[in-house]
């Protein structure tokens, strides 16, 4: 599970994939994207326009309170 505890913290995509999937990171490259989509569905008021789980293109995700 990904723990996001600091506002403005960028969760680097490849770092998190490697932590979750180890050496099989390439095989699971869509896992984090799907996981973030599920988090948005559950926690955002409007998942199509997220305010808390922001995608940083080419970098990863930003969690904002």
Swiss-Prot record:
Domain of life: Bacteria
GO molecular function: DNA binding
Gene Ontology BP term (one): phosphorelay signal transduction system
SUPFAM superfamilies on file: C-terminal effector domain of the bipartite response regulators
Record flagged with keyword Transmembrane: no
Keyword terms, alphabetized: DNA-binding, Transcription, Transcription regulation
Pfam families according to UniProt: Trans_reg_C (PF00486)
Protein name: Putative uncharacterized protein YbfI
InterPro entries hit by this protein: OmpR/PhoB-type_DNA-bd, Sig_transdc_resp-reg_C-effctor, WH-like_DNA-bd_sf
Record gene name: ybfI
Gene3D superfamilies: Winged helix-like DNA-binding domain superfamily/Winged helix DNA-binding domain
Coiled-coil ranges from the UniProt annotation: none
Protein biosynthesis among keywords: no
Residues annotated to bind DNA: 1-65
Signal peptide: none
């Amino acid at each position: 599970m990904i723990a996001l505890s600091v506002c403005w913290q960028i969760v680097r995509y490849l770092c998190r994939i490697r932590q979750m999937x180890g050496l099989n990171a390439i095989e699971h490259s869509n896992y984090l994207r799907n996981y973030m989509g599920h988090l948005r569905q559950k926690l955002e008021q409007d998942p199509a326009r997220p305010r808390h789980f922001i995608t940083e293109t080419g970098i990863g995700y930003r969690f904002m309170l």
